[in-house]
A protein has these predicted regions:
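Non-catalytic regulatory/gating segments with a bias toward low-complexity or hydrophobic composition
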Residues: 1, 8, 43, 78, ...
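Residues embedded in well-ordered regular secondary structure
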Residues: 4, 16-21, 31-38, 46-67, ...
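Outer-envelope exported proteins of Gram-negative bacteria
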Residues: 38-40, 114-116, 179-183, 200-204, ...
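Phosphoinositide-dependent membrane-docking surfaces
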Residues: 72-81
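A conserved hydrophobic secondary-structure block that centers on an alpha-helix together
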Residues: 76, 175, 195-196, 202-205, ...
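Transmembrane beta-barrel domains of outer membrane proteins
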Residues: 81, 102-104, 168-172, 181, ...
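Periplasmic N-terminal soluble interaction domains immediately after the signal peptide in Gram-negative
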Residues: 85, 91-95, 103-105
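Short, solvent-exposed loop/turn segments at secondary-structure boundaries
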Residues: 90-91, 191-195
Length: 301
């Protein structure tokens, strides 16, 4: 829908692979509340029950949204609704507009088998503008002497990928139509150790009775979903804070070995020397966050 519907702004979340997508229709309507549109799938409102990640220094991992459970190849059509007409049908939940999604049914035809693949790649494109001319004076403040060292945050990011494989089967007669589909979605985010995997299975049968005066439409979906290491909000669990504020002039390769053996405690501990990076912010080693503070969310429904 991006760039195809007037007055609709669509942006991906900053939580990485598997994160929710923000859909805002005709501008923001609230400064403090949610501005996302309501999804209605086959006439059923789907509310986003995922976590937003929270605010403050210790915000948690964000969540996905209801429409992310769908196999894209199961979608027949998408339309938008806003204003009084949306409120009349769906009440106050539709104050920010409605995205109407209709899924596919079986068709009156012989057996039709479709196999599809979609592969996309992503990279970190725009970095915050930071000065790299002066090194570190004390703590994390970069206003020391001139330095010839160059630190590029892009070195932390990977090339992300999103691969969707799908197979659909449709068949039917004048009185009965059947539709089956199965799909896999496998994504690797641009951040290390961030991934999203989803497996969809759909079955739907439509039968007409009493000279087409009565229609019985039965459908079922089974979804297996795994979110691994979506980026946390706030400061402490967010690797991007320490990545972007890393003092210029220091050696970033030194912290890539993110853990050291602590003889006193007899365990591996995080390597993040506060003598270099200061204690003004609640930050952690970004490699430690992505490799040792794994936050996973699994769902079967």
């Amino acid at each position: 829908l991006a760039g195809k519907v007037a007055g609709v702004q669509i942006s991906s979340g900053a939580t990485g692979a598997g994160g929710a997508t923000r859909v805002v229709m005709r501008g923001m309507k609230s400064l403090t509340k949610n501005n996302n549109a309501l999804y209605v799938i086959d006439g059923v409102p789907m509310f986003n029950t995922g976590s937003s990640g929270g605010d403050g220094q210790y915000g948690s991992m964000g969540g996905s949204d209801a429409v992310a459970d769908l196999n894209p190849d199961d979608i027949e059509s998408i339309s938008m609704m806003t204003g009084p007409s949306a409120a009349a049908l769906y009440g106050s939940a539709a104050a920010n507009g409605v995205v109407l999604v209709n899924t596919k049914k079986g068709k009156k035809e012989k057996i039709s088998l479709t196999v599809s693949n979609s592969t996309t790649f992503s990279k970190a494109y725009i970095m915050p503008e930071m000065q790299n001319r002066y090194g570190t004076s004390s703590g994390l403040f970069s206003w020391g002497d001139l330095t010839d060292k160059r630190y590029d945050p892009k070195d932390f990011f990977n090339t992300g990928s999103n691969i969707i494989n799908s197979i659909t089967l449709s068949t039917g007669s004048d009185k009965n139509q059947t539709y089956f589909s199965a799909s896999t979605t496998n994504s690797d985010g641009i951040l290390p150790n961030n991934s999203y995997n989803r497996y969809n299975f759909t079955a739907r049968n439509t039968t007409n009775f009493l000279n087409d005066k009565l229609t019985l439409d039965i459908g079922a979906q089974y979804i297996i979903q795994n979110n691994k290491n979506m980026v946390g909000s706030g400061e402490y669990f967010n690797p991007l804070v320490s990545l972007y504020l890393f003092p210029r002039g220091e050696n970033f390769e030194e912290v890539q070995m993110y853990e050291r053996y602590d003889e006193a405690r007899n365990i591996m501990t995080q390597y993040w020397p506060t003598a270099i990076f200061g204690s003004e912010l609640n930050m952690q080693n970004p490699y430690w966050i992505m490799n040792r503070m794994n936050m996973n969310a699994n769902k079967r429904s």
